Each structure stands twice: as structure tokens, then as C-alpha cells.
From Swiss-Prot:
The keyword Transmembrane does not apply. The keyword Ribonucleoprotein applies. SMART domains: Ribosomal_S13_N, Ribosomal_S15. One of its GO terms (cellular component) is cytosolic small ribosomal subunit. This is Small ribosomal subunit protein uS15. PROSITE patterns: RIBOSOMAL_S15. InterPro entries: Ribosomal_uS15 (IPR000589), Ribosomal_uS15_arc_euk (IPR023029), Ribosomal_uS15_N (IPR012606), uS15_NS1_RNA-bd_sf (IPR009068). Keywords: Ribonucleoprotein, Ribosomal protein. GO terms for molecular function: small ribosomal subunit rRNA binding; structural constituent of ribosome. Belongs to the universal ribosomal protein uS15 family. It comes from Choristoneura parallela. GO terms for biological process: translation.
Length: 151
């Protein structure tokens, strides 16, 4: 699949393990993994940060293979899911940082152009999440209130 605002094709990606069964050397059960997700979610970590932490320190290759559910679904069941989807949150955070930069550097034309691209990605992603009912239908991105969303 091609990139949205770049000429690259985006063919590089991580390969999923061939076998979808739980490795024999993994001593954690599904309940142990869910408990770890609960603890890390309480600390305020995002689903991808939780996945990295479980992979690096506990040896859980794919949470879905062990528990049968993805991390975000487990967090939703426990009531720990973030109110904004993670990718949208980080795009808004990037746009807020770019606006702050543009306040200090008014003549930075390239950053102004890149901000337009980032905000168009935000609008496109928000439209997708509204159709999937992840966001409420009246949710709207506004640059004036964006810093409050990511604070």
C-alpha cells in the first residue's frame, strides 16, 4: 500500500510468526498476560507500549496468540481503553507541536505545509473512525482545542 503524502510504496513490514500457536517455552498463561495488561494499562501505557513491554520483558510474542484477543479489546473489557484511538492521538499531538513551532518561527513555510498534510491525515482518520463508530458522529478536530485533547 502506498504512502499518503510521500512517493514511497511502503513495502517494508514486520513478518508475523509462521506458527500461530503459543511457544512451548512461554510459561505465562492467558490470565497472567491479562493481569500484566491491566497493570500496565493502569499506569497509563498505550496498547502498543504494552505490547512492546510484554514482548521485551516477558517474552510474549503476540498477545493475540496467547489470549485469543488483541490488547485493545482486553483493555476495553477492563474499562481501560483510551477515549481517542492511539494513531489519531499521536497525529493530534504532532499537529499541536507543529503549531507551537510555527508560533515561534512564523516564516517556516515547509512546516506550515507539513502541518496542512498532518491535519488532512487527522480529518481523514477521524472520518474513518466515525464510520466505524469509534468516535461519536459529532466529534470534530479543531486546532484551537487540540492542545486540550493531548494534554
Amino acid at each position: 500500500m502506498g504512502r499518503m503524502h510521500a512517493p514511497g510504496k511502503g513495502i517494508s513490514q514486520s513478518a508475523l510468526p509462521y506458527r500461530r500457536s503459543v511457544p512451548t517455552w512461554l510459561k505465562l498463561t492467558a490470565d497472567d498476560v491479562k493481569e500484566q495488561i491491566f497493570k500496565l494499562g493502569k499506569k497509563g501505557l498505550t496498547p502498543s507500549q504494552i505490547g512492546v513491554k510484554l514482548r521485551d520483558s516477558h517474552g510474549v510474542v503476540q498477545v493475540r496468540f496467547v489470549t485469543g484477543k488483541k490488547i485493545l479489546r482486553i483493555m476495553k473489557a477492563m474499562g481501560l481503553a483510551p477515549d481517542l484511538p492511539e494513531d489519531l492521538y499521536y497525529l493530534i499531538k504532532k499537529a499541536v507541536a507543529m503549531r507551537k513551532h510555527l508560533e515561534r518561527n512564523r516564516k517556516d513555510k515547509d512546516s506550515k505545509f507539513r502541518l496542512i498534510l498532518v491535519e488532512s491525515r487527522i480529518h481523514r482518520l477521524a472520518r474513518y473512525y466515525k464510520t466505524k463508530s469509534v468516535l461519536p458522529p459529532n466529534w470534530k478536530y479543531e486546532s484551537s482545542t487540540a492542545s486540550a485533547l493531548v494534554a
